[in-house]
Amino acid sequence: MKVELPSAWKKIETPLEPVAGSANTYRAADFDTLVDSPIIIGNPLTREFVIDGKRHVVLFEGDTSLIDADKAAADVQKIVNAAKGVMGSLVYPHYHFLTMVVEQGGGLEHKNGYLGMTGRFATRTHGAYMGFLSTLAHEFFHNWNVKRLRPVELGPFDYENENYVKTLWVAEGFT
């Protein structure tokens, strides 16, 4: 997939694998990987860190004027290290924590990334910040428990029919 950026937009962040030597070009191993990889294009607020040679991106898109990205990235790094301590290793080539700054919160795990939503005060009040971090940590842990160790119904998907998962309570409960 090649992305052509409008001149005012400077960044593309996605869990997809970049194609070496080809700017703004990404590849997916299969259709499931493609549709499981959110893409943020624009001028987001980003911070990065590396653990075990693996790039981690902490990104906020939207009204980021009140977001403390340095604080968030430092705490996300602690979450990654804690999860690594529990699970033994990091099972992905790189990871993207993509957060849309909106009015409500929530999130969804992806194989090599997280797409979440949070309010603009997420890093300004203790309660909002703990809510943001706990959702992010929960969805990040799904990288092991749900994306790699999963009920058979969770992949590969049947895109022609609804997919019902009778054991999702186990995956969510263990997380």
Regions found by a protein language model. Name each.
Residues 1, 138, 175:
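Terminal peptide-recognition signature
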Residues 1-52, 57:
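Intrinsically disordered, low-complexity linkers and stems that provide flexible hinges
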Residues 18, 159-161, 172:
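Generic structural "secondary-structure junction" signal
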Residues 45-167:
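Juxtacatalytic substrate-recognition/specificity segment
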Residues 83, 170-175:
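An active-site-proximal "capping" alpha-helix that borders the catalytic cofactor pocket
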